[in-house]
Amino acid sequence: MSTPARRRLMRDFKRMKEDAPPGVSASPLPDNVMVWNAMIIGPADTPYEDGTFRLLLEFDEEYPNKPPHVKFLSEMFHPNVYANGEICLDILQNRWTPTYDVASILTSIQSLFNDPNPASPANVEAATLFKDHKSQYVKRVKETVEKSWEDDLKDMDDGDDDDDDDDDDD
């Protein structure tokens, strides 16, 4: 069924395929255009540099008049990310407008890596370390980056059929 939300999401998908902003990618699930997997690469010159952070975006039929529900699937240590992966970002709540699309949502989240807002913390520990103990904050973030790589490698291994193990002629 074609609805305004679904048509808009297909336009968002076309934009992501043809002109995705640097460091972000996203696409709908093959069987559900209302649910998207996304990835943000940690920006250069930040503690998150080269991390591969996965997100889930869930839209309803009110999109783009209502923001999607967005959360990190990857472990994230950040002042503006709750332990459950939900993100404290004004455009996902009270400052949402229908002009935002998937690309702008992801670039806004990516900008939090450059410029966390410890004044409005979702993770008090991360906010405190960011403000008062920057080296400890950076250490924790870098551990999260390494975990993101391990998760990617695990996902790659899970996707392998390991057929060549059965072909050994020892």
Curated annotation (Swiss-Prot):
Keywords: ATP-binding, Chromatin regulator, Cytoplasm, DNA damage, DNA repair, Nucleotide-binding, Nucleus, Sporulation, Transcription, Transcription regulation, Transferase, Ubl conjugation pathway. It comes from the Eukaryota. CDD domains: UBCc_UBE2A_2B. Pathway: Protein modification; protein ubiquitination. GO terms for biological process: cellular response to unfolded protein; cytoplasm protein quality control by the ubiquitin-proteasome system; DNA repair; DNA-templated transcription termination; double-strand break repair via homologous recombination; ERAD pathway; error-free postreplication DNA repair; error-free translesion synthesis. One of its GO terms (molecular function) is proteasome binding. SMART domains: UBCc. Its main location: cytoplasm. Residues 148-170 are annotated as: Disordered. This is Ubiquitin-conjugating enzyme E2 2. Its EC number is 2.3.2.23. GO terms for cellular component: chromosome, telomeric region; cytoplasm; HULC complex; MUB1-RAD6-UBR2 ubiquitin ligase complex; nucleus; Rad6-Rad18 complex; RAD6-UBR2 ubiquitin ligase complex; UBR1-RAD6 ubiquitin ligase complex. Transmembrane segments: none annotated. It catalyses: S-ubiquitinyl-[E1 ubiquitin-activating enzyme]-L-cysteine + [E2 ubiquitin-conjugating enzyme]-L-cysteine = [E1 ubiquitin-activating enzyme]-L-cysteine + S-ubiquitinyl-[E2 ubiquitin-conjugating enzyme]-L-cysteine. InterPro entries: Ub_conjugating_enzyme, UBQ-conjugat_E2_core, UBQ-conjugating_AS, UBQ-conjugating_enzyme/RWD. It is found in: Cytoplasm; Nucleus. Residues 4-150 form the UBC core domain.
